[in-house]
Structures are given as C-alpha cells and as structure tokens.
Amino acid sequence: MKLIPLCALTVLITMGACQSNNPEEISEAKTADTTQIEADTITSEEVIVKADINEQLNSFTQMLSGEPTAYKSDLSNRDIWLKYSKSTSAKWNKLQSKIALPIEQWVNTKGYNQKHPNRTLLYPFAGGDYFYAHLFFPNVDTIIMVGLEPPGYLFDPQKVSSEELSTYLYDLERSLFFPHKLGFFRTKSMAVDFKKGLLNGTLHTCLYYLSKFGNQIHYIKAIDFDENGDFSNEIDISNVKHGRKGYRIGYSTPTDKQVKELVYFAENLANSGVYRNGPNGKKIIIPAAKYFEKHKGSSAFFKAATYLMHKSYFSWIRNTCQNSCNIILQDDSGMKLESLKEAGYDVELLGEYTRTIPLFSNRFQEDLKEAYQSAQPERLPFNIGYNAQYGECNLQLATK
C-alpha cells in the first residue's frame, strides 16, 4: 500500500451478491497460478487527505439507521421515525450480543488479521453485507464488494409522504434482520427487497451497518469504470437516480486517522458476464473485472456463495482470487477444498461440517467431511451460513 504522509485517505471497496447459475462456459478461463504471493506485493487503494464529514449524507445515514442523535426538530413524520428508531435499536443490540460480539472475540483470538495485515478485502457475492465483512476483517482500509443487486441511490426524507417513509423503514428493517435469522442473505429475497420503491439498492443496507458500527460519512460517489479498470464519471450520489455501475463510500470513526472506503458494484461474476468479444475474436475481460484484478496481496471472504466457484463457468473469479489473495476465509459454499490445496494454500478447518441444506445436497463434499472427521476442530462460538438453522457452522482459513 502506498502511504502519503498524514495527508492520505484510504479506500475500502465492496463487491458481492450471488450470481446467475446458467452462464455459458468460457474456454479462455484462466488457469490458477499457485505461485506464492510475496509480502511486498501487498497493495491497497491510494490515500488522500481526510475529508470533512458530509453533514447531509451523515444525517441521512443516521436517520435510516435509527440513531437517536439523528432526530431533528424539523424531521417530518417524527412519530413514524421514533417508533422505527426504538425497534431497530432493540434488534441491533440483540444482533450485537448474539452474533457480532462472539465473532469479534473469536477474530481477535484467532489472529489471522495480524499475521496477514492486508489492507484490502475482496468480497464477491456480497450483496449489501458490510456487516460480516467488517466483523471478520475489521482492520482493512478498502473493502471491495460485488453483487447482482442494484447499487441504489438516496432520497430526501423531508419530501416523502408518511406512508412512503413507513414502508421504506419497514422494508429496510426486514431486509437487514431477517437474513440473520437464516444465517445468510438470500439472493432471491435481495432481488425483491431492493426493488421496493425507496429501498432501491445495497447502498441503504451498507449505510445502515456503517452507521451502527460508529462511522461517519465523508462522501458517496456514484461510479463507472473506464477501459483500464479505473473509476470514471464519478459524481456525488445526491445527483444520481439510476444508471451507474456502483458507488464508493468514504467513511471513518472519530478515532480513525484516515478515511476508509467501501466500494460496491453490480456485476455478474460468471465467465459469461466477465468476458466479452474483443479484437480478432479474442475474449477480453470487462472494465470492472480489470479493476478487480488490480488488488494483489488482498484478503478474500466468501459466505453463502451458493457453491458457484465449484462450477467451471465461474473459473475467472475463483482463479483471480487465488492469484491475488494470500488469505481466504470461507465456508463450504466457497471454493472446493481440493481447489484451495492445488492453488498452494494451507487450509485450517474450523467448526464442523456434516451436511448441506437440502437445496444444495448435490454440492456435499465427501472429502471435506472426511478432513473434518480427521482434524476434529472445535465448534465455532457463532452460527452463520446455510447450516445455521441446524446450529452448525463451518469455516476454512486458507493461507499462503
């Protein structure tokens, strides 16, 4: 990571959401490079001066997260908002004690972030899930999330009706907390949730989580990518209603010395979504994929990824992460155990693995079950992922 004396601002990018299951296979899919990733290849986004807090964006973020300090005497629909604030605060506190605190304690004890102090996290198939990205990788400066869900845009809470605001807050709260009961975010549910009027994309859930974790907002930029895989056509999110590839959010806590950044963009990560026809009939990758490939020496995280990287037509995202990342934390829905080992990773098994949910019974990995039976790792002190409903959780920590 290139640091600029204390005049710098860090970046954090987010990617995610589960992909289409039927893209065509691309013959030019790259072969995994099993070469060791040297420490000096670790990179991150460049940093710039810590910007001022954007009071308008910060107030909106506190409003949607139900923060008591967000209440303004001139806020319309005060009764609706106060009721929501009380409800969402109670649910958040329960989520903190049941899920967040056990994960934070486990992460601190495990120490993988100290052994691999990467500054960037790649989170494919993430949707709007900043929550788990932050809990498992709290020290990164840049989180890059990718998903199929639309990025979304904002609205003026003073210019919506009581009915519109009430519906928005109800839909937002449901989209945030129902997935934690399941242990994962459902792709189909997110596709429906993020097409409901004012709740129009992942931007809303990311801002909620950012606020609840004590962050303030410096800027939100709507983004596209140029042919080199760099950000282009950036404009303030307040001037956008639709049509952009994604966004980047600059944020920090009061104690942070620099601004971090979360980047989200919507893209189909199947080979058929990543490759396009270039000159002379050759396949080339799209600009967003070029951007993703720039982050060598990163960490990667996969949770409830619907086993997409078990398939040949998701080889680009699998190989890119294996070539770019010296640490991968995933559950069994990420990469196959044999794929990680073939790519040169040492794999530590965590939790327990005895089954898949019925929907993915054809993705059960017998070799992974045998490896767990041999290793006999301790149970994890939290339940996330598809098997949370069975009181069971597994993770694999792959390092090289």
Summary of predicted features, one role per range:
Residues 15-17:
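C-terminal motif of bacterial Sec signal peptides marking the signal peptidase cleavage site
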Residues 182-250:
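Short helix-loop boundary/capping segments
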Residues 19-21:
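Bacterial signal peptide processing site
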Residues 2-9:
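Sec-dependent signal peptide recognition
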Residues 30, 37-179, 246-253, 257-400:
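Non-globular targeting/processing and membrane-anchoring segments
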